[in-house]
């Protein structure tokens, strides 16, 4: 779903383990790492999109996690000109609703091959603030906003 301004509606997931470390996934066939994320389909709520993406990208089901919080606002980022899609509808970036989840099931339930088109090749747990400086540069500010917003929910 791309809005009139050219931003694609998207959800992003910060998944915590019991030690409050976060899931960090390496994009398939790439060297870049990121949080699970994906588009919101027409007629889908952000919560529904989050659960769908959670299963598609890392194999987890709603019963495997607890939703701790979500951002009130949509956080936007622009993509570099070289990545802007030139055919209609033109997409200049993403607007994201972020979700903070706590893993309730064993980490062995994480399955990067739950989908026919896996998003990630590899994953690991990293410290809470690590992703801000290790995600692709044009996503750093939205990562900073989301992690800062969620910090108050972490015990």
From Swiss-Prot:
Keyword tags: Hydrolase
The molecular function terms of the Gene Ontology recorded here are:
pyrophosphatase activity
At which positions is motif Nudix box? 38-59
Cofactor(s) needed for function: a divalent metal cation
Q: Which Pfam families match?
A: NUDIX
InterPro entries noted in UniProt: Nudix_hydrolase, NUDIX_hydrolase-like_dom_sf, NUDIX_hydrolase_CS, NUDIX_hydrolase_dom, RppH
* Enzyme Commission number(s) from the entry: 3.6.1.-
| Matches recorded under HAMAP family | Nudix_RppH
Similarity comment: family membership: Belongs to the Nudix hydrolase family. RppH subfamily.
Q: Which named protein is this?
A: RNA pyrophosphohydrolase
Species whose genome carries this gene: Francisella tularensis subsp. holarctica (strain LVS)
